[in-house]
Amino acid sequence: MAAAGFAWLVAVDEAGQVLGYGYFAPFRERSAYRFTAEDSVYVRDDIRGQGVGKALVAELIARAEAKGLRQMIAVIGDSENVGSIGLHISLGFRQAGVLKAAGMKFGRWVDVVTMQRALGEGEKTLPAE
C-alpha cells in the first residue's frame, strides 16, 4: 500500500512497543472511486481511549487530503464498537449506513457500520485529474 502512495502508520511508545496502527487504501478498485479511500485503525486493547486511535486517524485524514482524495469511508465491523464509532464521529465522520448481519466475528453475526467524511473540498468541486 505504501508503495502505491497510500498511508500506513504505526504508533509506538518510548520503549518501541506497538500501541496501534492505521492505514488507508482504495475504497474500491474501480476508476469511479479513485478519489475515495477507506481507513482502518487498530489500537491495543489496554490503551484504548487514550488518544492513539484519534492521532492515527487524524494523520490518515491529513495524508489523504494531501494526496488529493475527496472522501474517506470507515467500515466498522461491529455496530457495538462504540469506541471506533465515537472516534470517527469526533473527527467529522457521519454514519452513512448499517449493513445488517454482514459480518461474522467471535462466533456471532455483527452489523457493519459505514461512516463517511469529506476530505478537502469534498464534493463541492471536481478534483484535478
Can you say where each PLM-predicted feature lies in the sequence?
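Conserved G/P- and acidic residue-centered "switch" motifs that form tight phosphate/ATP-binding loops
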Residues: G51-G53, G107
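Conserved GNAT acetyl-CoA-binding A-motif
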Residues: A64-G77
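Acetyl-CoA-dependent GNAT
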Residues: M1-D46, V57, R63, A118-G120
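Conserved beta-strand-loop-alpha-helix junction that forms the acyl-donor binding cleft
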Residues: R48, A74-S84
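Conserved catalytic-core motifs of GNAT/GCN5-like acyltransferases
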Residues: Y23, V75-I76, I89, R94-D111, ...
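Acidic/histidine-enriched, glycine/proline-rich intrinsically disordered or flexible terminal extensions
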Residues: G120-E129
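Short acidic/polar active-site loop segments enriched in Thr and Asp
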Residues: A7, R70, R94
